[in-house]
């Protein structure tokens, strides 16, 4: 895999979000550090971690929630939908694990099977250290021996999140994909609210719930890798021609722009999930590639190998 710099920038009337990810090259995969849980875990105090003329970034160390507020408009964008964060209700595990996770990850185990992680349910520890204009969080998934460091930095346009892949540690399980701030660009389920996805020249997904089933979207930026055999698609969608996504609104909204590394990215969205009560759109970055091959076993029967 070629070394890639992955950058995502989200622009809005109320706030802008910049997310930077760096993928590892194939030559450097062996140089990834082996997983070691540190003897002590640093924990930053809750409160303001950065501010400028326009924006303030806050960190809640108890609920592991990062949120940014606009001083002029009062608009708040949060890693956990802000109403849910303030409610303190965590009785539904499915809802809590989805909405309270600032990071999703997928890894491949020793048997070659993909497994999913979320920071709320699966992170044994989240180390938090204040840095210049922001905070560094390291997510330790001790059971599967994977750690992922992410730096969140406030800037004049909004917030950036960056992963230094040289800081990722692994054991026998291998990190495959990372999704940062999956509910930062989210809206309440309502027929008047919408998600913008870049299907073809662009499409809108209404965020209504109860009227129809949950709708999901997941498409690779610029289409599938031409080197791999195409898989059968059950939904008719157009290729993604522009690395963008967002939340439209009358007075404020979010526009996500992947400015580098878009060839590794997927745009994902979920609309109308009643248990979440929120609809969201975000980006996934795949740090490793995979392919599916059809082979024949000794009995001349077909078998699918990932």
Which residues are covered by each model-predicted region?
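Short, Gly/Pro- and small/polar-rich lid/capping loops
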Residues: 31-42
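Carbohydrate-recognition beta-sandwich/jelly-roll modules
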Residues: 49-306
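Hydrophobic alpha-helical transmembrane signal-anchor segments
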Residues: 16-19
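Bacterial lipoprotein signal-peptidase II cleavage site
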Residues: 25-29
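Bacterial N-terminal signal peptides that target proteins for export
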Residues: 2-11
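Generic detector of short alpha-helix boundary/capping microenvironments
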Residues: 11-12, 42, 151
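C-terminal motif of bacterial Sec signal peptides marking the signal peptidase cleavage site
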Residues: 21-23
